[in-house]
């Protein structure tokens, strides 16, 4: 078994598990055992780009606010970009955030984030292990072109009750497990709930007590909840049943209510003469249930599963006002409601057999019915007692998808092994049928006892895309299914790598790769997303993308110290006929260089210290770097110096000039994370664990965007020579010390 230690950011190579490609990984907390055969697996496994995180590793990862996070652990891998710092984006080998498949005990989930992406939607206390694929996708997986994250729940305890309570800065969670019928039926359950709304309530009350004298009342609230349930029943030694339920939901409200507190000399809101309230409310989340039936055969396993999964998001923007509270006829409002949802009903049947460790067979059939509401938009107004409602009448779109696959893995000897598979998919939506074949293959050839060369190819299709108008991905971004106008997204990924074990307890992996992507979707330029008169298809345009790079990982273990260095090199391009005048442009997350350096020192059995440094080339954004003068333009994007006499009757203002899409690169992103783990034993015999960490220890303010300002140095003297432009970077995350405590019972 491989010994694995923890560091501030995990940098996994290509075999962190028995079915992955690197041997060891670095995490931040304590030494744990991970499924794997160590260096031997690094050389002999045919697959590439697979990483496995153990349950202990996931549960103990310290990140911002002391909350361990699966997705942020994956962000530290070479070839994986985080998007914006601190958020749970996953941009794998030039792909986008919607191109990642997340399976929770086989249940497909969408948009797996809380608090706008600060936390992922997975309660790590309920997780057993995670298998992550960024290349050589097995044929049993499909539907997303960039990565697969397959999350397995902890098995419940059939013999005794137990659990743990974890407390962090912003939330707490509880995990319990135990038998219902000892030895035959058992359950496990997890509950995680944020207490941001509870902690902020006293502060909000104090602020409103102060601002009500000025006729203002602030509206603010946020909470998220996760619930997980697993029920297992052993029918006999060969047959078992399993039911898993998942629920994760967020609610956010933000607004301001203004009222007249002076007209009547009162600070009581009910006594005011008028009010004007603006509010925004956002809710999003996933819920679902899956039932699995397992039947153990002589040489293999047969599994059948049925599931239901739904994701939805709702955004409401409202303004209510009344000029005279004594006169109901003066009440008016304007409201906008945007919604989108996906509901899946599916069934799976799979078979796996292992023949003497020489030949492994996997085969199966999947079916899914997808029900989409791509864009529900309702605008309503009440003016002068007359109500007006605008509805885009967006129809539900239903698709049926059937897939069949076969995976074959052969190990001829210690020198050669290969895996070959094929997946066939038929998707029918709105009268259009798409039939696609997806070949998958990988090969390993050993070069002596300590080196091997691997190569892989995978084609995969995606039948729904999420299109964003923002710099970060939001839960309100719409999921768009394929149609007669927009074909399925297709990716071809080519990989080749060298793997080796070196003297001095050192091992490495180097992978070169190229990815080709067709039928990407983006919003058209100059189109209003909230226009109810345009069908969602008319707002989009289709194009292509390609990316290529090299991923490198080197790890060495010396005594109590383990160190890992990872490096990723990436080029990421897009080309749309209707965007950027048809000229290719770099993608938002064209992060050229990425470095992770991690070290862990185990002082003794109770205390461990960790440090990790991360460097990433900055993201890209579209920014006007020039202005030009347009006489008579009254509302330009930004002013620019006019000719002599500007400011008199011949006023001239300027308009922003955009040279190209994603033309500016943000400054490089780097930070240092430090951590310490302390294990304790209580008098009652129960164990506990403190996790103390410092995120961004030297407080480097990494830029998330750039703002353009126009400044006149001389007040009330708008002379041409005094005007100049400035560009300011905006940052979000400073140094964040945090802690968490886990109590085991």
Question: Where are each of the predicted segments found?
Answer:
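Periplasmic N-terminal accessory/gating domains of Gram-negative outer-membrane beta-barrel systems
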Residues: 33-35, 44-98, 106-137, 154
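Transmembrane beta-barrel wall of Gram-negative outer-membrane proteins
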Residues: 170-194, 210-255, 281-301, 308, ...
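C-terminal beta-signal and adjacent terminal beta-strands/loops
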Residues: 198-199, 606, 615-652, 667-671, ...
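Flexible loop and strand-edge segments within Gram-negative outer membrane beta-barrel domains
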Residues: 240-296, 302, 310-341, 474-475
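Surface-exposed extracellular loop regions of Gram-negative outer-membrane beta-barrel proteins
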Residues: 262, 312-314, 449-494, 514-537, ...
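Outer membrane beta-barrel strand-and-loop segments of large Gram-negative receptors
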Residues: 336, 340, 344-348, 392-398, ...
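Structural signature of Gram-negative outer-membrane beta-barrels, strongest in the C-terminal barrel
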Residues: 342-344, 352-362, 366, 393-517, ...
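Gram-negative outer-membrane beta-barrel transporters
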Residues: 514-516, 534, 538-625
């Amino acid at each position: 078994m491989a010994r694995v230690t923890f560091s501030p950011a995990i940098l996994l190579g290509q075999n962190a598990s028995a079915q992955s490609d690197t041997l060891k990984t670095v995490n931040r907390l304590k030494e744990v055992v991970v499924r794997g055969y160590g260096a031997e697996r690094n050389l002999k496994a045919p697959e590439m780009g697979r990483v496995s995180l153990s349950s202990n590793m996931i549960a103990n990862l310290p990140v911002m606010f002391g909350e361990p996070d699966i997705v942020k652990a994956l962000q530290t891998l070479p070839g994986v970009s985080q998007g914006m710092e601190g958020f749970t984006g996953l941009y794998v080998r030039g792909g986008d955030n919607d191109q990642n498949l997340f399976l929770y005990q086989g249940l497909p989930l969408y948009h797996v984030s809380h608090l706008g992406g600060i936390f992922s939607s997975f309660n790590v206390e309920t997780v057993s292990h995670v298998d992550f694929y960024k290349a050589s996708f097995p044929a049993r997986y499909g539907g997303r072109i960039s990565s697969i994250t397959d999350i397995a729940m902890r098995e419940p305890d059939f013999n005794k009750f137990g659990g743990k309570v974890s407390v962090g800065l912003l939330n707490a969670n509880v995990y319990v497990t135990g038998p219902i019928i000892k030895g035959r039926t058992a359950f496990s359950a997890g509950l995680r709930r944020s207490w941001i709304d509870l902690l902020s309530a006293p502060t909000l009350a104090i602020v409103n007590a102060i601002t009500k004298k000025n006729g203002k009342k602030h509206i603010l609230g946020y909470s998220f909840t996760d619930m997980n349930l697993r029920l297992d029943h052993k029918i006999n030694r060969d047959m078992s049943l399993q039911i898993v339920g998942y629920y994760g939901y967020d609610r956010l409200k933000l607004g301001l209510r203004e009222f007249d507190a002076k007209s009547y000399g009162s600070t009581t809101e009910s006594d005011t003469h008028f009010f004007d309230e603006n509010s925004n409310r956002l809710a999003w989340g996933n819920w679902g249930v899956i039932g699995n039936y397992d039947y153990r055969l002589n040489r293999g396993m047969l599994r059948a599963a049925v599931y239901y999964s739904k994701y939805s998001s709702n955004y409401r923007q409202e303004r209510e006002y009344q000029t005279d509270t004594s006169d109901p006829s003066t009440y008016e409002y304007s409201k906008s409601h945007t919604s989108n949802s996906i509901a899946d009903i599916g069934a799976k049947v799979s078979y796996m057999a292992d023949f003497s460790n020489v030949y492994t067979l996997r085969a199966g059939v999947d079916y899914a019915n997808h029900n989409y509401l791509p864009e529900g938009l309702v605008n309503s107004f009440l003016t002068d007692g007359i109500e007006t409602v605008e509805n885009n009448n967006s129809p539900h779109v239903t698709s049926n998808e059937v897939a069949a696959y076969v995976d074959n893995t052969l190990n001829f000897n210690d020198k050669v092994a290969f895996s070959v598979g094929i997946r066939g998919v038929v998707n029918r939506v709105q009268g259009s049928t798409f039939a696609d074949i997806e070949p998958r293959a990988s090969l390993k050839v050993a070069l002596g006892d300590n080196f091997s060369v691997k190569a892989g190819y995978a084609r995969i299709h995606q039948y729904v895309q999420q299109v964003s108008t923002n710099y970060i991905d939001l839960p309100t971004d719409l999921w768009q299914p394929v149609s007669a106008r927009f074909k399925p997204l297709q990716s071809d990924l080519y990989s080749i790598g060298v793997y080796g074990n070196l003297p001095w307890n050192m091992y490495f992996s180097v992978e070169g790769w190229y990815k080709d992507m067709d039928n990407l979707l983006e919003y058209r330029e100059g189109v209003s997303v909230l226009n109810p008169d345009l069908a969602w298809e008319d707002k989009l345009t289709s194009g292509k993308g390609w990316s290529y790079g090299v991923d490198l990982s080197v790890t060495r273990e010396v005594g109590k110290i383990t160190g890992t260095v990872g490096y990723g090199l990436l080029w990421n391009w897009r080309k749309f006929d209707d965007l950027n005048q048809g000229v290719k442009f770099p993608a938002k997350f064209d992060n050229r260089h990425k470095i992770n350096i991690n070290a862990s020192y185990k002082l003794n059995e109770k205390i461990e210290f960790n440090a990790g440094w991360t460097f990433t080339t900055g993201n890209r954004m579209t920014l006007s770097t020039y202005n030009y003068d347009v006489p008579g333009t009254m509302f330009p994007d930004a002013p620019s110096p006019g000719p002599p006499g500007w400011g008199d009757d011949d006023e001239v203002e300027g308009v922003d000039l955009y040279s190209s899409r994603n033309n500016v690169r943000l400054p490089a992103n780097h930070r240092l994370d430090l951590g310490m783990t302390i294990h304790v034993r209580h008098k009652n015999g129960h164990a506990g664990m403190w996790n103390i960490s410092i995120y961004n220890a030297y407080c480097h303010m990494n830029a998330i965007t750039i703002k353009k300002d126009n400044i006149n140095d001389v007040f009330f003297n708008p002379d041409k020579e005094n005007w100049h432009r400035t560009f300011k970077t905006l940052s979000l995350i400073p140094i964040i010390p945090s802690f968490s405590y886990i109590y085991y019972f």
